[in-house]
UniProtKB/Swiss-Prot annotation:
This is Polyadenylate-binding protein 2-A. The gene is pabpn1-a. The RRM domain is essential for specific adenine bases recognition in the poly(A) tail but not sufficient for poly(A) binding. The keyword rRNA-binding does not apply. Residues 84-97 have a biased composition (Acidic residues). Residues 146-296 are annotated as: Necessary for homooligomerization. GO terms for biological process: cellular response to lipopolysaccharide; MAPK cascade; mRNA 3'-end processing; positive regulation of polynucleotide adenylyltransferase activity. It comes from the Eukaryota. It comes from Xenopus laevis (African clawed frog).
Length: 296
């Protein structure tokens, strides 16, 4: 029984000593850092949080109130976790800002390039439009030599024919200047026309000369059967082709003449008085049989 009582007394003493250790400085007046290791760990954690706050000031240039409150007010693990989250958020905010700055620098350059490309395209379209307009004007405007007859009315054409003559048996190498010089003494020459075959491009051997007045036509008839480039030319007033008129100045129907002209080789003696040298023989197979006779 004595052994049991001694064991019980020892356990009671140990229990009392444990209560004194938990009580801390209020019971014995000692420093909590000596008997309570948890108290010393809390101070060290606060010092570490302060050091981390100072480092964040050097990196970010400023500290938010949330860092200090998170470091001192929270527990050891909670304060450190909140500080790391705040630092990560600041880094994430700074990085997008840098990227946004780079984009703002590149965007004006791209816009300038696009604007320049648009200007070049507009200039190209304007040039195409100008070229099309010039081509249309060139196609619509006839040559100066053909502009007059195209716009002339029937009355004007008849009046011009009354001032013109037909010159036959003209040398194939003759030019308009030579014909104008040959008839220059008869009056002022307004225009000289030498007709050519549309298939071969060779001259047909006759020409038209238009004077400025009708008196010159009567004067030019004196040059009938005169020599021009070694040939005896035929000079007669130009006849105006009128629609609906089937007769000619020769006194026989025009349709009858054309029907016989298709076989002019067998009846060439009939027309030999008008044309000393039938010119239809030069264009064998290609020139029309009527080209040597029809002056108009």
């Amino acid at each position: 029984m004595a052994a049991v009582s001694s064991v019980a007394s020892l356990r009671g003493a140990d229990y009392e000593n444990g209560l004194r250790g938990v009580a801390g400085p209020s019971d014995g007046g000692q420093d909590p850092g000596e008997d309570d290791p948890m108290g010393r760990g809390t101070l060290d954690l606060e010092m570490e949080l302060l050091e981390q706050g100072r480092r964040s000031r050097r990196v970010g240039g400023r500290t938010t109130p949330g860092r200090r409150s998170g470091g001192r007010g929270g527990s050891g693990g909670g304060g450190a976790g909140g500080l790391e989250e705040l630092e990560d958020e600041e880094l994430e905010e700074e990085e997008p800002g840098e990227l946004t700055g780079d984009q703002t620098i590149e965007d004006p350059e791209l816009e300038a390039i696009k604007a320049r490309v648009r200007e070049m395209e507009e200039e190209a379209e304007k040039l195409k439009e100008l070229q099309n307009e010039v081509e249309k004007q060139m196609n619509m405007s006839p040559p100066p030599g053909n502009a007059g007859p195209v716009i002339m009315s029937v009355e004007e054409k008849m009046e011009a024919d009354a001032r013109s003559i037909y010159v036959g048996n003209v040398d194939y190498g003759a030019t308009a200047e030579e014909l104008e010089a040959h008839f220059h003494g008869c009056g002022s020459v307004n225009r000289v026309t030498i007709l050519c075959d549309k298939f071969t491009g060779h001259p047909k051997g006759f020409a038209y000369i238009e004077f400025c007045d009708k008196e010159s036509v009567r004067t030019s008839l004196a040059l009938d059967e005169s020599l021009f480039r070694g040939r005896q030319i035929k000079v007669v007033p130009k006849r105006t082709n009128r629609p609906g008129i089937s007769t000619t100045d020769r006194g026989f129907p025009r349709a009858r003449y054309r029907a016989r002209a298709s076989s002019y080789s067998s009846r060439s003696r009939f027309y030999s008085g008008y044309t000393p040298r039938p010119r239809g023989r030069v264009y064998r197979g290609r020139a029309r049989a009527t080209s040597w006779y029809t002056p108009y």
